[in-house]
């Protein structure tokens, strides 16, 4: 209900004027293809410490009488860069319904500079607003000094009004984020109550952007 596509590692962001001027997109363009065509090599499902078979027909045997204290789903991705490298993504679900996401990039020498590294979550419907605890305004690694820590609510999810659309909306050093929406693709719902998705840091603060377009669309 919250996801339009399966979450995947992302290596590409929208270009900026500085990128175009320095020809960054030419030097690091291989990450665009890696972002678009990343290959999932392996899926592991672990239930209470025991590995399960993740594919049909074996995974059709789970009924309402099957219980577990913890489920871990691990994905191993391989990039189509030269040389290739791998990214490990694991989702750990506990009995409370909380999902912990861990992402590990296995770096190798010889690859160009990263445009960005993270996870992309695409929602099926537009968000109304978001609330977060972190730095004020748009912040980037070189623009954090002028920001203030606090809790901020953003109701305008449109792009920053640059003459040429480009990367925007980044929020650095975030402790938690709450995305609110009231529209879904669930036709069985007759109410229009707001729904909230909360994302919290594990041990380190994170950066995020919440935009109505993907990087390739921008």
Model-derived regions: residue spans:
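Beta-strand/loop-rich accessory regions of lumenal/periplasmic or secreted enzymes
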Residues: 1-218
């Amino acid at each position: 209900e919250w996801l339009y596509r399966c979450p995947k590692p992302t290596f590409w962001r929208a270009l900026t004027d500085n990128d175009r001027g320095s020809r960054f997109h030419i030097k690091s363009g291989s990450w665009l293809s890696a972002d678009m065509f990343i290959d999932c090599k392996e899926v592991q499902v672990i239930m209470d410490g025991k590995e399960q078979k993740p594919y049909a027909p074996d995974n059709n045997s789970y009924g309402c009488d099957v219980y577990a204290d913890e489920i871990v789903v691990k994905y191993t991705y391989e990039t189509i860069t030269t040389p290739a490298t791998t990214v490990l993504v694991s989702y750990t679900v506990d009995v409370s319904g909380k999902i912990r996401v861990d992402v590990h990039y296995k770096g190798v020498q010889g690859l160009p500079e990263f445009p960005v590294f993270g996870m992309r979550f695409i929602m099926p419907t537009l968000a109304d607003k978001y609330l977060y605890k972190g730095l004020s305004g748009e912040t980037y690694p070189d623009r954090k000094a002028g920001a203030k820590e606090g809790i901020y609510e953003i109701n305008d999810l449109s792009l920053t009004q640059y003459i040429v659309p480009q990367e925007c909306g980044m929020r650095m050093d975030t402790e938690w984020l709450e995305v609110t929406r009231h529209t879904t693709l669930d036709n069985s719902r007759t109410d229009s109550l707001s729904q909230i998705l909360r994302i919290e840091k594990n041990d380190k603060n994170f950066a995020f952007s919440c935009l109505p377009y993907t990087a390739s669309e921008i």
